[in-house]
A protein has these predicted regions:
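Internal, glycine-rich beta/alpha segment that forms the wall or movable "lid"
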Residues: 1, 83-190, 200-207, 211-220, ...
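N-terminal beta1-alpha1-beta2 module of alpha/beta enzyme domains
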Residues: 1-66, 70-71, 166-169
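Hydrophobic faces of well-ordered beta-strands that scaffold small-molecule active sites
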Residues: 3-7, 40-42, 72-74, 102-106, ...
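An alpha-helical appendage that flanks or caps ligand/catalytic pockets
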Residues: 5-7, 123-159, 200-303, 313, ...
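Active-site mouth loops of central-metabolism enzymes
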Residues: 7-23, 77-85, 165-175, 230-233, ...
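Short, acidic/polar
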Residues: 19-31, 90, 175-182, 287-296
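Glycine-rich, proline-tolerant flexible connector loops at the mouths of alpha/beta enzymes
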Residues: 39-63, 78, 196-199, 308-320
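Alpha-helix-loop-beta-strand connector modules within alpha/beta enzyme cores
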Residues: 53-74, 128, 132, 323-337
Length: 337
């Protein structure tokens, strides 16, 4: 099983100088690479108050220049907000800069503020995503592209750049709600499940995904990815104590701002009791216990786990110590699964 280092929006606006934030995150990248993580995953949002965050394409292009062969992923890019022609050519360019190490994770997004800012509708996200991806695949594989859909139109278009990987980079498609799970299965893409679904829901949704793949005649893709909030310490008691302090601020902000665009179960969990959310969805404990919890997802068919190791107002030294502990006792255990 492979393990990825997940970077999300966790730095509270104004709590850290932006240049210091970048230098800290660059140091975290180098530490996670040296720790043996297989992939470095960078999230994507706009106007995500109260956090400050950098955009994925320039970040991943910069990281591609670092030594090593760590894979680089968008986790996930909010495709319905963007123009697919621009995304297709940005991805092709970045894939060459990465020399084929790019993974393109795609998702719908869940925030009305972002849809409003980009002139799209929440209700159109699924349709826009499907059509945009179809058009991007044409731009990556066809010499001349003609496309006349609901949202996008091209006539006799000739792509400017093709990806390094053939026919194009590996895709991960995010889904939280059952309709989104069905859409990913219907289109035959690898499934990427985010950090808030509880285990029993995931088990049911994996069954739904496989049923949908079979219904539409698709083989089971090679990859299936799970993202989890994560905190490891020398023992479970210390891990729970440190995790609670780290998670509290982040999920207090999620609760205050709501968690839109998912099903009712997800909304109630993310805006409800933190202790229940931790019990249901997070990986927390000593090193062996963390590996055992990850193994449960391996048993469901996941071959990739992406973990978030730092949270609002976590000192950089604590982040680096956390990476060091995970490198010593968790990464090797996950690789053996």
């Amino acid at each position: 099983m492979e393990i990825a280092y997940q970077v999300g929006q966790v730095v509270i606006r104004g709590s850290l100088d932006l240049q210091q934030q970048w230098q800290d995150q660059l140091a975290q990248f180098r530490a996670s690479r040296d720790a043996g993580f297989d992939t470095y995953c960078w999230a994507h949002h706009y106007l995500i108050d109260p956090f400050q965050h950098f955009q994925p394409f320039p970040v991943l292009a910069r990281l591609a220049a670092e030594p090593g062969n760590m894979k680089l992923a968008t986790s996930v890019l909010l495709l319905p907000l963007l123009n697919p022609v621009d995304v297709a050519e940005q991805v092709a360019t970045l894939d060459h800069i990465c020399e084929g190490r790019l993974i393109l994770g795609l998702g719908l997004g869940y925030r009305p503020e972002e849809c409003e800012a980009f002139g799209t509708q929440m209700s159109e996200r699924g349709a826009r995503h499907s059509e945009a991806l179809e058009l991007m695949q044409k731009l990556w594989t066809e010499d001349e592209v003609n496309h006349h859909g609901r949202f996008y139109h091209l006539t006799g278009a000739h792509p400017t750049a093709r990806p390094y990987q053939k026919p194009y980079p590996k895709l991960w498609l995010a889904a939280m709600s059952d309709p989104a799970i069905r859409r990913v299965g219907r289109e035959g893409h690898p499934l990427f499940i985010g950090p808030v679904q509880p285990y029993n829901t995931i088990r049911r949704q994996v069954d739904l995904y496989h049923q949908t793949l079979e219904e539409y005649g698709h083989p089971i893709p090679e990859d299936m990815v799970i993202v989890r909030e994560f905190f490891c310490a020398e023992n479970r008691e210390d891990a729970l104590d440190k995790a609670r302090r780290g998670f509290e601020r982040k999920y207090a902000e999620y609760s205050a701002h709501g968690f839109q665009g998912t099903d009712e179960e997800m909304t109630s969990k993310i805006t409800g009791d933190l202790e229940a959310l931790m019990d249901d969805t997070f990986i927390v404990g000593g090193p062996d216990e963390c590996v055992e919890q990850i193994a449960r997802y391996r048993d469901l068919g996941f071959n990739q786990v992406s973990i978030r190791l730092f949270y609002p107002e976590t000192p950089q030294k604590d982040v680096m110590d956390h990476i060091e502990l995970v490198a010593k006792d968790v990464v090797p255990g996950v690789h053996k699964l």
